[in-house]
Structures are given as structure tokens and as C-alpha cells.
Amino acid sequence: MGLTISSLFSRLFGKKQMRILMVGLDAAGKTTILYKLKLGEIVTTIPTIGFNVETVEYKNICFTVWDVGGQDRIRPLWKHYFQNTQGLIFVVDSNDRERIQEVADELQKMLLVDELRDAVLLLFANKQDLPNAMAISEMTDKLGLQSLRNRTWYVQATCATQGTGLYEGLDWLSNELSKR
């Protein structure tokens, strides 16, 4: 009986725990996003070798965000972070037109992985403040997102250094994950 009341109390008033995996190619802005969400400020970053993990509390949800390095030699290690992932944040440098096909290939590989079949997908179209940044519609097209079936996804325009779009993305993520 005590356990039942305790679990009910925690469901009503406690924070829901969510495991989020944040990936993307190198220099897309993953670590900048993580620490902007965590600390509310921009921190000086260096290329991530391995991972950073932080807890971000937002709207009564406690997101455990795993930021994994994106250099090509590190990407094979991404699979070690897939288990129990409820939300996948894929960060894309909207200004990097030369590597958009590489982004599409990596994203499609991940979406075929069985361990991620139930994870919702949030794409942060980062660096929207740059003059040649791809529009959301162009990025959606180049990444082939319209053809995704049986996958809940959303693209959010962001600028990590200014913080724009980040909380809107978390809003979408928290709304989708709270339905589960």
C-alpha cells in the first residue's frame, strides 16, 4: 500500500525521467546546445571525444541528455548509447551544405537500429543565424524526412549561441514523451 501511494505521489508531483541521446556531425553545436540548456549560457567548447552527460530539468521533466562526439571516427561508438533512449536529438549545422548528404546517411543508419525504434526524433536545425543557413523545408527535403513512416519527428530551427528555438524543441519533446 505504501509503495502504491508513494508511486502515485511521485507520478503526480515528481519529475518524469527521460533519457535523451544528442548526436550529429562534428561542429554541429551539440555541446553548445547542451550547456546552453543546462547553464543558460554559452561555454567555450572543444571537440567532444567521448561524451558529455547532463541533467536538464524542464517543465516537470528531468531530461538526462547524452551529448556524444560527432567526428567520423567516433560515430561507430554511438551505438553504445542507444539502449533505453526515449528521445533522439539530431543536431544539424544548417549552414554546412557540403555535408548534408553525410548527415542524411548517418541519420538513416540510426533510424534503422532496432534499439531506437520507439525513440521520438527531434532535429535541431542549428546555426539559423548564419546568412546561408538552409531553411527547414530544404533541410527536411534533403534529409528525406517526409518518407519516414512509423516515426514521430519534428524539425526545430535553432541558434545555440543565442538560445533561440532550444526551448521550443524541448516543448515538443516533452509533449511527445509525456504521451507515452
From Swiss-Prot:
Q: Which InterPro entries match?
A: Arf1-5-like (IPR045872), P-loop_NTPase (IPR027417), Small_GTP-bd (IPR005225), Small_GTPase_ARF (IPR024156), Small_GTPase_ARF/SAR (IPR006689)
Residue spans crossing the bilayer = none
Judging by the UniProt lineage, the source's domain of life is Eukaryota
The cellular component terms of Gene Ontology attached to this UniProt record, alphabetical and capped at eight, are:
cytoplasm; cytosol; dendritic spine; extracellular exosome; glutamatergic synapse; Golgi membrane; membrane; plasma membrane
Look up keyword GTP-binding and say if it applies: yes
What NCBIfam families does the database record attribute to this sequence? small_GTP (TIGR00231)
Hey, which family's this protein in?
Answer: Belongs to the small GTPase superfamily. Arf family.
The name this protein goes by in its record: ADP-ribosylation factor 4
Q: Which organism is it from?
A: Homo sapiens (Human)
Name the gene for this chain: ARF4
